[in-house]
Amino acid sequence: MPSTGVTSLKPATLSELQGYLLNHKADVDLFRLRGPFDVATHKDHELRLSTTERIDADLYLSAPAEKAPLVILLHGDDSSKEDHAYQALHLATWGMHSLAVQLPKDGPWVGNGRTLARMVTFIHRQPEIIDSRIDVNKIILVGHSFGGAAVAIALAEGAPAAGGILLDPAGVGKDMPAFLRKIDKPVMLLGADERYSPVRDRRIFYEYIRSGIAEVSIRDASHEDAQFPLEPAPQEPGTDPAATEELQITFVSALTSAAFSLAHTGNVDFAWTSFSDAIKDGKFFDVLKK
């Protein structure tokens, strides 16, 4: 388990936590710590969308009895649901159920986006297939790299989600601008530092999504820092790790703030305000909002 520590907040309910966070100064660093709630983990939970279509996912259920948001996380190319396990767990400690899904890891990513849209529609209609405590009006989509493109495509295809969070997303071809122009839900883009870790066509997301999008880059972060498995990936002797835990924690804190913002306010403004000190300090840079 990463060494984040646990918040000193002790709300009795999700509503109490929500009230506290919305009535105090928004600060992304608060979310570097794990949240106050216990989490029940269900590995390899099978979602049966039809008699022929099944999706494997890991489910992280937050303890409160109230209805709560659902955050769905999608990996990128040549990656897996396990690469986002700690992010999903961390979100659930803050009162947001999480589902890390496994789709074909080599794409096609337009197809994965459409599968994601079908899955969200299915959950929206029948939340009890996961848990009766899911608030279907507060489903948030999160995707890393090409998974970020798939999230954008799902939103463009009309997935009934409250918004999306793109973790250092990469574009997937000439049709991306047309998909991006169709998005009418709020989006937060959390990018790595392009000086060290450029990805393909990241700039098109802010360029072509018409409105309701905000973007920040995390200084010195790599593309892999936008992932966060429960156990670090093995590395060759004498090589530097692809990801740094400190920067992974920075990513997960920004992700948690953005997910809370989208779920509980319907826009990115809470998260944007929470980033203000990090922007002033230069930890977050290349900031854009429209």
Please provide the spans of the model-predicted regions:
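N-terminal cap/lid segment of alpha/beta-hydrolase-fold proteins
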Residues: 5-66
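Short beta-strand element of the alpha/beta-hydrolase
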Residues: 67-76
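Short amphipathic alpha-helix adjacent to the substrate-entry channel of hydrolases
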Residues: 82-102
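Gly/Ser-rich "nucleophile elbow"/oxyanion-hole loop immediately N-terminal to the catalytic nucleophile
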Residues: 108-149
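Hydrolases whose catalytic domains are alpha/beta-hydrolase-1, hotdog thioesterase
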Residues: 150-155, 175
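Conserved hydrolase catalytic core segment
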Residues: 154-162
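The feature captures the conserved acid-bearing segment of alpha/beta-hydrolase catalytic domains
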Residues: 162-225
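Alpha/beta-hydrolase-fold serine-hydrolase catalytic core, especially in secreted/extracellular enzymes
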Residues: 229-290
